[in-house]
Amino acid sequence: MCGICCSVNFSAEHFSQDLKEDLLYNLKQRGPNSSKQLLKSDVNYQCLFSAHVLHLRGVLTTQPVEDERGNVFLWNGEIFSGIKVEAEENDTQILFNYLSSCKNESEILSLFSEVQGPWSFIYYQASSHYLWFGRDFFGRRSLLWHFSNLGKSFCLSSVGTQTSGLANQWQEVPASGLFRIDLKSTVISGCIILQLYPWKYISRENIIEENVNSLSQISADLPAFVSVVANEAKLYLEKPVVPLNMMLPQAALETHCSNISNVPPTREILQVFLTDVHMKEVIQQFIDVLSVAVKKRVLCLPRDENLTANEVLKTCDRKANVAILFSGGIDSMVIATLADRHIPLDEPIDLLNVAFIAEEKTMPTTFNREGNKQKNKCEIPSEEFSKDVAAAAADSPNKHVSVPDRITGRAGLKELQAVSPSRIWNFVEINVSMEELQKLRRTRICHLIRPLDTVLDDSIGCAVWFASRGIGWLVAQEGVKSYQSNAKVVLTGIGADEQLAGYSRHRVRFQSHGLEGLNKEIMMELGRISSRNLGRDDRVIGDHGKEARFPFLDENVVSFLNSLPIWEKANLTLPRGIGEKLLLRLAAVELGLTASALLPKRAMQFGSRIAKMEKINEKASDKCGRLQIMSLENLSIEKETKL
């Protein structure tokens, strides 16, 4: 992973030899292993490239990379498939070699159509004065742009600035395809014209599915001197996933399971589905494709390969290379179980569990069958889960910290220890006070969340930042000790809810518009995931010099799930804890998981209790005043005390 940036000026009076201090600082946070700047000048424009590398595979390759013809490449991504990269090779150099050999724009598009994995990039084509840039289909890597000085300059960057003046001008580059700017023409016309090469799907019948994001949608928030146009040759990138299966069942879904639609979730209900031969095949196919996705994401990183036998035996001293954002819910439990299959057994795995603690609260909160207002009896935790919660809470030294995700996390830890007792599972209890939340939101986090600006973005962005920082308490046999996770790779379960009808709004849509409406909701979820979640989470996690990886958004996983009819992925006639993400729950049972397979969805902002920390009368979609960017004079707080 890297922090990449390109600052372009079309006026000599704005030429600069360096980036603004706060932007450079933010980029270096993302890439602690090497930093380099490169200046490319023409008569009428100047490009300042800056790249900061987090080394994760092959030989450390300093960026920007430049070839003998003056082409410059900045790459923030991982090639997991599509283009062959050997274990000892660096994907930046491999991709740049291919890119340098491309003879025309069609070959460039074909190259990026083949890449599977998360990416954003900037490519300067010297001979033609073109600047190419873009993000992968899902937008798993951040890239922002801002245009200023009435078209005399613009900037592309993985992350924005902390200062109030520029902060509001940054916007996310849409994950709509590749963009190309003719720098020489821009100087002549005085207007910045972005040529778009969109994502399109070509069916076997040679029918082209148009990109969802229209040119007008992309242009809507841009300044008047910036326009987005379709590329003149009408070329495109091939979408890396198949379209969503919109098929509807011939018989009403309710008739298959009407006798169990009003009972609490139990393992026996899931076992009924496992007796179906076809369903069992689908479950195994899902496990296989998701397992491969996890394998790619936990093995593509450097490890200590030359340890002595004695060093291998000292597993308590071994460093975890992989961490998981861990609530103990179904998504993180399945990811952890599959990661255990592929990570060397002598290597610990960090489970990062975050809780927000209001100091004035001294009484623990627990699951209460009668104290909570239940909408229906389907929300009552299963008997099996309640027993596991009680056992896990009794063993914890931080018993007063009992927010929902901490309770389910402790119970999930016990499940994982039962499934894989030889593994060292580092359950990292990360407790955040109101004071720490407010201080670090102001000095470090708010600019990472922006340009997103809602209450929901604030809650999730802050929770993910503290969780991925990995500073907390480790409960070990010898007692409780302070701990900081140094794992460079952080796995997250984003994408499971969107594809498998995990959100409460999916159930609402199903109840009002049936399976057809549910299909449309899932299609909409996948279409907007790049602008809703992924850029924000990449910026937040990357700020710690760590890389977010998303197994549920692996291209092959998404294509597999898209190919299935909706009723094989979810059955919302069934109660919470079973019907949503049904396929994932069945996979969890097959993998040997128990109580966690029945946990209903709980959003991170509620499970971690960050939503209870401040104003409780806000709506998730409200603009969040707490995300206002700080002024220049306050920047020194973070610079003096780096956390």
UniProtKB/Swiss-Prot annotation:
Active-site residue list: C2 (for gatase activity)
Domain of life: Eukaryota
GO molecular function, one term: asparagine synthase (glutamine-hydrolyzing) activity
Record flagged with keyword Amino-acid biosynthesis: yes
UniProt keywords, alphabetically: Amino-acid biosynthesis, Asparagine biosynthesis, Glutamine amidotransferase
Domain Asparagine synthetase: 285-601
SUPFAM superfamilies referenced in this protein's UniProt entry, alphabetically: Adenine nucleotide alpha hydrolases-like, N-terminal nucleophile aminohydrolases (Ntn hydrolases)
InterPro entries xref list: Asn_synthase, Asn_synthetase_domain, GATase_2_dom, Ntn_hydrolases_N, Rossmann-like_a/b/a_fold
Example of a GO biological process term: asparagine biosynthetic process
Glutamine amidotransferase type-2 domain mapped to chain residues: 2-184
PANTHER family: ASPARAGINE SYNTHETASE DOMAIN-CONTAINING PROTEIN 1
Name of the protein in its database record: Asparagine synthetase domain-containing protein 1
Species annotation: Homo sapiens (Human)
Record lineage: Eukaryota, Metazoa, Chordata, Craniata, Vertebrata
Gene name of the record: ASNSD1
